[in-house]
Structure formats: C-alpha cells, structure tokens
C-alpha cells in the first residue's frame, strides 16, 4: 500500500539528482511505500555497489543477477548528491555482493570516510548485508565510525529456507553481536518484515534474541508482495497488533521501536538516533 504522493516537486528534484549522479536508492529499487514522504523531505537511503543482488530473497524487489565491478568514483558522486540535498544524516545500504572477497565492506568504508572528511558533523548510518559472516569485513566498516550499524534479520528462523535464500539466522545475529564487541559506541538496529506466515511467539522470540545481542533499535513492518513471482502475503497485521509489538519491544529494553504497517528499516532513521 503506497502512501499518497506528496511534495511532487521535491520528489522530482531528488529523482532527477539521482539519475544525474548515477546513484541508486533502495527506496526506488524495493518499491518502498514511504518513498514519496522521504523523497519529499529530501531524505533517501542510498544503495551502493550497483543494483543487482547476488542473493534471491523471496520477498525482495531488487534485481537479481551477476553485478558489475565496483565503481571507485561512486563515493564521490554520493558526496556530491548529499551536498546538493543538504543532508546531515545519510543512510547507506547495498545489494549483497557475494562475488566480492570482503562482500563490499571496503567500499562501504570508503563511502563513510569520504562523507565524513568532506561534510562537517555528518552522521552516517549503514544498512549492511551479512558479509557471509566475515568478522574482519565488519571491522573494516566499523573502523569508520558509522553512527548506526543496521543489519536486518528480516524474518523468523523457521522461514529462512523459503524467504531468505542463502542467508543464515545465526550469522545475522552474530553480525549484530560482533558489532557491539568491536565498538560499543555504535548503535545497532535490525528489522523484521511481518506477513510471511510467522507466529506471534516466533516474532517475540526473535525480538528476545535481538536484545540478547544488545540490539538498540527495532523496526517491524508489513510485507507487501511486489509481484506475483514473489512470496505471497500470508497475513496482514492490524494497527493494534503492530502497537502490541511496539509495547513489547519497549518492555524488552529497545531504545527505539518503530512498529507500523509501512515501517521499513531506514524509515525515520534520524528520529531513532534523537531518542537516545
């Protein structure tokens, strides 16, 4: 369910800039329901390392296939786009790049470094893939001091074989656990998409698992099927059910919880930081 298209002139301005800069956003590639709101406010989650993913998650609308090589100029194009938009809080994500030895970690690090070296007081949040469980790759990213390290578990362990093909629940938890071991000053975040057929008790158990690795921020949102070839929606959750999960999350000790049908992991990212 898409939100009404607001701020049309700003929406067009951001899209025009992205095309000119040859940059991608996960907002567009994943058909995010919040795109008009975020673009209207001149915010976006930039997607580096191309727009083709080496994984085939059953819910994701990002193009699958063999990606192109890494573009060494991309961090500088990203810098110019951020400057033009006047952003002070930037979210960077990527497709999963299992074809790269470090999963793209060094490119993430370069993007963070270029932004921080050229824009005073810039805050950078990263939404990273699992780097195939490579702890050294995670260290490379954290060395550049992003303000938030986001890695999404996406669904409950039972549904991984059908929903997150190629991923591993324990590996994803380890990314969040290792992040705190490497640098406690960096906030961690994760998200769950609901509607694949998970049970309430399974969702709560995942929330408990996230707190057990000291995850700070939690996002829960409704799954909307992008096309007939994607995983079907098994259940649509009510506003009341999302509210209940939010209350449970705060009771567990999460610093900030966004639990709404249209919530996505980067939605209101800066607000989560302000809450700390």
Curated annotation (Swiss-Prot):
This is Lipoyl synthase. It is an enzyme of class 2 (transferase). Pathway: Protein modification; protein lipoylation via endogenous pathway; protein N(6)-(lipoyl)lysine from octanoyl-[acyl-carrier-protein]: step 2/2. Belongs to the radical SAM superfamily. Lipoyl synthase family. Residues 39-255 form the Radical SAM core domain. Its cofactor is [4Fe-4S] cluster. [4Fe-4S] cluster 2 binds at residues 53, 57, 60. It is found in: Cytoplasm. [4Fe-4S] cluster 1 binds at residues 27, 32, 38, 266. It comes from Aquifex aeolicus (strain VF5). The keyword Transferase applies. InterPro entries: Aldolase_TIM (IPR013785), Elp3/MiaA/NifB-like_rSAM (IPR006638), Lipoyl_synth (IPR003698), rSAM (IPR007197). GO terms for molecular function: 4 iron, 4 sulfur cluster binding; lipoate synthase activity; metal ion binding. GO terms for cellular component: cytoplasm. The lineage of its organism: Bacteria, Pseudomonadati, Aquificota, Aquificia, Aquificales. Binds 2 [4Fe-4S] clusters per subunit. One cluster is coordinated with 3 cysteines and an exchangeable S-adenosyl-L-methionine. Its EC number is 2.8.1.8. Its main location: cytoplasm. Keywords: 4Fe-4S, Cytoplasm, Iron, Iron-sulfur, Metal-binding, S-adenosyl-L-methionine, Transferase. HAMAP family: Lipoyl_synth.
